[in-house]
Design a protein with these regions (language model features):
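Hydrophobic pocket-lining "lid/loop/helix" segments that shape and contact the acyl-thioester
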Residues: 1-87
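Claisen-condensing/thiolase-fold acyl-transfer catalytic domains that form or cleave C-C bonds
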Residues: 36, 58-136
C-alpha cells in the first residue's frame, strides 16, 4: 500500500470546505501515466515478494477506472486480457466499489473458482495505490 501527496494536483476535489460541494479535477494524461507506472511496478513488486510471476495469476481483478489503464498494466506485467476481470462495460467506474463488484461478477459467472490466484489492484486520487495477492 502506497500514498504520495505529490500527485494531489493530478486528481482531486477542488473544494476543502464541508459547507460547499466541490468538483473533481483531473489531468487525464498525467493520471494515466501515474496509474500505469505505479500499478505495474506494484504488481511486479507484489509478485516478487511472493516468489511468483504473472504466470501464477489466474485472474487480475483491478480497479475499474479506465480500460486503457487496465490494458496497459496487463500488457506491462505480461498478463493477457483473457486473465483480467473487466466490468467497465457493465458497471462503469464505480469508484471504491469497482473491485468488489468485479470480484462478485467473476465469482457469479463462474470464472473465479476456489484455488484461483487473484491479484487485486486499486488506485485513488491524491494518490494512494495498493495490491493484494490471494488464493480464492
Amino acid at each position: 500500500l502506497y500514498s504520495d501527496g505529490r500527485f494531489l494536483s493530478s486528481l482531486h476535489v477542488n473544494n476543502n470546505s464541508i459547507n460547499e460541494l466541490g468538483t473533481i479535477e483531473m489531468s487525464g494524461n498525467e493520471v494515466f501515466k501515474i496509474a500505469v507506472n505505479r500499478l505495474s511496478d506494484l504488481a511486479e513488486e507484489t509478485l516478487k515478494d511472493c516468489n511468483m510471476t504473472s504466470d501464477d495469476i489466474t485472474w487480475m481483478v483491478p480497479h475499474q477506472a479506465n480500460i486503457r489503464i487496465i490494458k496497459a498494466v496487463a500488457k506491462r506485467i505480461n498478463l493477457p486480457m483473457s486473465k483480467v476481470i473487466q466490468t467497465l462495460d457493465t458497471h462503469g467506474n464505480t469508484s471504491a466499489a469497482s473491485i468488489p463488484l468485479a470480484l462478485d461478477t467473476g465469482v457469479r459467472d463462474g470464472r473465479i473458482k476456489k484455488g484461483d490466484m487473484l491479484l487485486f489492484e486499486g488506485i485513488g486520487g491524491g494518490f494512494s495505490w495498493g495490491s493484494v495477492l490471494t488464493e480464492y
